[in-house]
From Swiss-Prot:
Gene3D superfamilies: Apolipoprotein C-I (4.10.260.30). Belongs to the apolipoprotein C1 family. Inhibitor of lipoprotein binding to the low density lipoprotein (LDL) receptor, LDL receptor-related protein, and very low density lipoprotein (VLDL) receptor. Associates with high density lipoproteins (HDL) and the triacylglycerol-rich lipoproteins in the plasma and makes up about 10% of the protein of the VLDL and 2% of that of HDL. Appears to interfere directly with fatty acid uptake and is also the major plasma inhibitor of cholesteryl ester transfer protein (CETP). Binds free fatty acids and reduces their intracellular esterification. One of its GO terms (molecular function) is fatty acid binding. This is Apolipoprotein C-I. It comes from Eonycteris spelaea (Lesser dawn bat).
Amino acid sequence: MRLILSLPVLAVVLAMVLEGPAPAQAAPDISSAWESIPEKLEEFGRTVKEKVRTAIDHIKKSDFPEKTRKWFSEMFDTLKEKF
């Protein structure tokens, strides 16, 4: 039963592989790929910059730093008392 089902699937896969890539899927020209790298790097830098700036603003607006300092000072005080 499995062999009967797997043979048509194998035939379809083999036909797709032998057909080759579609024109839209063809590899782009290497020179155009090299030309687009600086643009992509600039875009990546801008998005990283925006995300980091947003994260820093979020941390500044939250009460997380204050709670963290308070927790560390409490833990330090309890350690002092134990020793």
